[in-house]
Amino acid sequence: MKKPLLLLLVAYALPALAQTHYPTAVADGLEKMAAPCVQAKGSPYFKQALTVADLNIDGLPEYIVDGSRFVCKGAESAINQDGGGTVEIYTGQSDGGARLAFAHAAHGTYLKDDYSYAKAEADIAAGGDPKTAGNLSRLYLIVSGELCRKNSETEPESPCMRPLVWNIEKRQFEFNGVHATIGLSESK
């Protein structure tokens, strides 16, 4: 199927998404995710799969695409049905664009919003909006296997949550430590 026709099908199937302006890189990522669904004559549904938050505290949005939350109505078998998917994070750029800064398979995501008084003071001192000053968002991926630092021969396979951190030098997100303290029931 040619790209213009696929774009037309995605735009027809996703009027809310088509009316919202996302950076080209994000729209291309969503289109790639929707392609098998559209080709199977399903209707892509991204409402739960796309989240916008400032994860690297630069004042620009990050676009979190969680493949485990993508739904293909009418052609469910066209997409991964094992409860997982690829998580992609696109970092917002000052020119309004975005670039891919992380991609990894996961069982899902958990976005934790928090507040920092130190960040609030810095935000307000820099002329930031007092209503949003101090807001922090941290993204956790629900993963399993070696990422949970478990010995597969002696420990049962069970998921854990791993936080992502921003590596400013590499300009990408990376895994940081094992965090199983946040209950997995909160992530759904």
Task: Indicate residue ranges for each PLM-predicted region.
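Beta-propeller fold detector
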Residues: R99-A106, F175-T181
